[in-house]
């Protein structure tokens, strides 16, 4: 089940996805488990329009948080502005509506709710909805550089999976590169092994949905096969990489977006990328990352190798050979 919210105007106003009958409802204003352990907002993923963040919490949660722990919808926009970026769409993947209301967001920013069950790999319908929303946004925002903000509860597992799934399926990015780019920009590694394994070894998901009539209010899905190059406007032309007019849509689609591939690899190989934003790289397996101290807090039962690399130092950090975080499990 998905819900669009845009009270005035915008490219997403008329869309309404159908699916699950209702979201899972939970009472109370208890803080989500482990929510405090994660950075509020990551960095923009270079070569893309994506930025990931944990769910902001409405004002009623603040009495249970220290002032420095609060992260409200207003705080979200302030932190995005501090990075000299602007949000143009928020995609909410949480499976509840208790954390904040669309009305808490600026009226000028479209909001899309895609109810996504946690812990399990999203189904093909959810993946397609996400791809359709992203491509619709890119199509309508070719002439600006606004970002797509994506969040689940922690802005990590469901968020990372769907962003990486898009990069792999639509942009043709290698799974390892997509996962590493997300990990570095989010400041935390994807944790769920089933998500990582599906991204690494699972099938490419089709970029169209045969169950949705082409004449429906879902609009013409053919533009999913024509991903808009999402490079910043002033950095060169956009390329319409796959013309399909007059042809049937292929079952699977890869785009070899060379500039995006180069951006991913260049970013991943830059050992100083975190110094600009004061974020350490994601933690190696078997270690408990504490972003407040910019160091690795080694678990008592960690391996000898983990104990040997106890702290992170920004000036001698060398890129970990991927996969650095594959053995993290819940």
Swiss-Prot record:
EC number: 3.1.3.-
InterPro entries hit by this protein: Dual-sp_phosphatase_cat-dom, mRNA_Capping_Enz/RNA_Phosphat, Prot-tyrosine_phosphatase-like, Tyr_Pase_AS, Tyr_Pase_dom, TYR_PHOSPHATASE_DUAL_dom
GO molecular function: phosphatase activity; polynucleotide 5'-phosphatase activity; protein tyrosine phosphatase activity; RNA binding
GO biological process assignments: protein dephosphorylation; RNA processing
Phylogenetic placement of the source organism: Eukaryota, Metazoa, Chordata, Craniata, Vertebrata
Effect ascribed to mutating residue 152 to S: Loss of activity. No effect in RNA-binding
Active site: 152 (phosphocysteine intermediate), 158 (proton donor/acceptor)
Signal sequence residues: none
Compartments where located: Nucleus; Nucleus speckle
Name of protein: RNA/RNP complex-1-interacting phosphatase
Effect of residue 119 to G: No effect on phosphatase activity with ATP and ADP
Complex formation: Monomer. May interact with SFRS7 and SFRS9/SRP30C.
Role description: Possesses RNA 5'-triphosphatase and diphosphatase activities, but displays a poor protein-tyrosine phosphatase activity. In addition, has phosphatase activity with ATP, ADP and O-methylfluorescein phosphate (in vitro). Binds to RNA. May participate in nuclear mRNA metabolism.
Compositionally biased region (Basic residues): 1-12
PROSITE patterns tied to this protein: TYR_PHOSPHATASE_1, TYR_PHOSPHATASE_2, TYR_PHOSPHATASE_DUAL
Matching SUPFAM superfamilies: (Phosphotyrosine protein) phosphatases II
CDD domains, per database record: DSP_DUSP11 (cd17665)
Domain Tyrosine-protein phosphatase: 61-208
Binding-site residues, substrate: 153-158
């Amino acid at each position: 089940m998905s819900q669009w919210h845009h009270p005035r105007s915008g490219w997403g106003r008329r869309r309404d996805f159908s699916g699950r009958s209702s979201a899972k409802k939970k009472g109370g204003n208890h803080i989500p488990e482990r929510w405090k352990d994660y950075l509020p907002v990551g960095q923009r993923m270079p070569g893309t329009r994506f930025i990931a963040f944990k769910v902001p919490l409405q004002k009623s949660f603040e009495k249970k948080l220290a002032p420095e722990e609060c992260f409200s919808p207003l705080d979200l926009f302030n932190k995005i502005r501090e990075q000299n970026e602007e949000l143009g769409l928020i995609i909410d993947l949480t499976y509840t509506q208790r954390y904040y209301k669309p009305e808490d967001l600026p009226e000028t920013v479209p909001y899309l709710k895609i109810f996504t069950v946690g812990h399990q790999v999203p189904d093909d319908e959810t993946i397609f909805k996400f791809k359709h929303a992203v491509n619709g946004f890119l199509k309508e925002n070719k002439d600006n550089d606004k970002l797509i903000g994506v969040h689940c509860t922690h802005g990590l597992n469901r968020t990372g999976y769907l962003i990486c799934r898009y990069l792999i399926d639509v942009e043709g990015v290698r799974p390892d590169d997509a996962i590493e780019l997300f990990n570095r920009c989010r400041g935390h590694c994807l944790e769920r092994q089933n998500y990582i394994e599906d991204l690494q070894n699972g099938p490419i998901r089709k970029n169209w949905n045969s169950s949705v009539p082409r004449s429906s209010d879902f609009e013409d899905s053919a533009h999913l096969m024509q991903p808009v190059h999402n490079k910043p406007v002033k950095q060169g032309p956009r390329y319409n990489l796959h013309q399909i007019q007059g042809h049937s849509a292929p079952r699977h689609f890869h785009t070899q977006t060379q500039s995006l591939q180069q951006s991913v690899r260049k970013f991943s190989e830059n050992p100083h990328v975190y110094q600009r934003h004061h974020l350490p790289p994601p933690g190696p397996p078997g270690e408990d990352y504490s972003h407040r101290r910019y160091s690795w807090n080694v678990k008592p039962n960690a391996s000898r190798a983990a104990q040997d690399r106890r702290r992170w130092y920004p000036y001698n950090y060398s890129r970990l050979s991927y996969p650095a975080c594959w053995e993290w499990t819940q």
